[in-house]
């Protein structure tokens, strides 16, 4: 019996790449332009099927708005931002950016995508934590 392989949408792939670059940026503290370029070069073969303009927008705009994003997240976290698992922080930052600034993307899509990305990159229970936090943030941003 063959296992059915689900093809990921270009936007899902863009979100996955944005989370990876946000993680690298947070860990390394290198310039965002350097992180993005190195990621694209390193992942050359993996970049097929990625909505590149959306990936670049998500990464760059999340970095540009990180103070706003972090201030939105802070009241809904059970610990300080710096104590979050770095990958969870990257997923939350991306999702909060989308909830706040990408108003053409339905909030349910943003939350679902964050959960799915957490299942790929996060710890075993990360997706539940991500869901709980975003479920509280969305109404606060008038997205529910």
UniProtKB/Swiss-Prot annotation:
Gene Ontology cellular-component terms listed: cytosol
Keywords: RNA-binding, Transcription, Transcription antitermination, Transcription regulation
SUPFAM superfamilies xrefs: NusB-like (SSF48013)
BP GO annotations: DNA-templated transcription termination; transcription antitermination
InterPro entries documented for this protein: NusB-like_sf, NusB_fam, NusB_RsmB_TIM44
GO terms for MF: RNA binding
HAMAP family: NusB (MF_00073)
Protein name, as recorded: Transcription antitermination protein NusB
């Amino acid at each position: 019996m063959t296992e059915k392989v689900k093809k990921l949408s270009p936007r899902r792939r863009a979100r996955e790449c944005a989370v990876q670059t946000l993680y690298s940026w947070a860990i390394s503290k290198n310039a965002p332009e350097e992180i993005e370029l190195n990621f694209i070069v390193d992942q050359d073969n993996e970049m097929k099927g990625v909505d590149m303009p959306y990936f670049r927008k998500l990464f760059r705009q999340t970095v540009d708005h990180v103070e706003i994003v972090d201030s939105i997240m802070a009241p809904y976290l059970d610990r300080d931002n710096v104590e979050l698992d770095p990958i969870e922080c990257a997923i939350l930052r991306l999702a909060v950016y989308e909830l706040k600034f990408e108003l053409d993307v339905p909030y349910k899509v943003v939350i679902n995508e964050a959960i799915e990305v957490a299942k790929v990159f996060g710890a075993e229970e990360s997706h539940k934590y991500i869901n709980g936090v975003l479920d509280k943030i969305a109404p606060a941003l008038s997205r529910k």
